[in-house]
Design a protein with these regions (language model features):
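Acidic, low-complexity intrinsically disordered regions
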Residues: 1-202
Length: 202
């Protein structure tokens, strides 16, 4: 259960969830024979359910694949479920555009911002995605004003290396605003709140 201090910290943030709907999300390599897409639905719904108790006006949501990046504001768990029912994995991974859309949603209030990106593969725009993060970092006034947490779904080693580079080795940033976790690392946390607090403090 979240402590009063944790809840007080997270109440200072708006939250945006970005969901990778690229073709590789259909890969069935999650424990129990599940697809990455099915597993991510379960994980995203849980994340939204937990954080909607803190962010009462609803979460921001970005869904991205191929040339299609969609944004939704003020979503709840039912909207997350609807998004998954209406889509199936296809196309490539336009991460830079997705991050730009997430930052636009996040910047609608004076609160600090937390963006969580569920993704499984290397984006088709690696350098552009890194530039979006770098530019966002350099606009911040404090190191906790913006946090971007990547959670890698699946086991693509190239994707893992890329996300860890964004976390540990991205050059030219005013602040380190990125944290990256594998799904196994994320699941070790007792709660969504603990995971988010750790990413903010990282």
């Amino acid at each position: 259960m979240a402590t009063e201090q944790q809840i007080a910290t997270l109440s200072e943030y708006d939250f945006v969830v970005a969901i990778d709907a690229s073709g590789s999300m259909g890969t069935e390599d999650i424990k129990g024979g599940r697809s990455r897409w099915a597993f991510m639905q379960e994980t995203a719904e849980s994340f939204c359910r937990d954080l909607s108790k803190i962010d009462a006006d609803g979460l921001g949501l970005v869904v991205f694949s191929g040339t299609n990046v969609e944004s939704f504001d003020g979503v709840d768990v039912s909207k997350i479920s609807e998004v998954f029912k209406q889509r199936s994995p296809r196309g490539s991974t336009p991460l830079a555009e997705a991050l730009s859309a997430a930052l636009k949603l996040a910047g609608k209030s004076d609160k600090k911002d937390f963006i969580i990106v569920f993704t499984d593969g290397v984006p088709d725009d690696k350098d552009a995605a890194a530039k979006v993060i770098r530019d966002a970092s350099n606009k911040q006034e404090t190191d906790d004003a913006l946090t971007i947490l990547f959670v890698q779904v699946g086991y693509d080693t190239d994707a893992g290396r890329y996300l860890k580079m964004l976390d540990d080795d991205l050059k030219g940033c005013k602040f380190d605003i990125v944290d990256a976790k594998t799904i196994e690392e994320a699941e070790k946390f007792a709660s969504t709140v603990d995971l988010v607090i750790e990413a903010i403090n990282d």
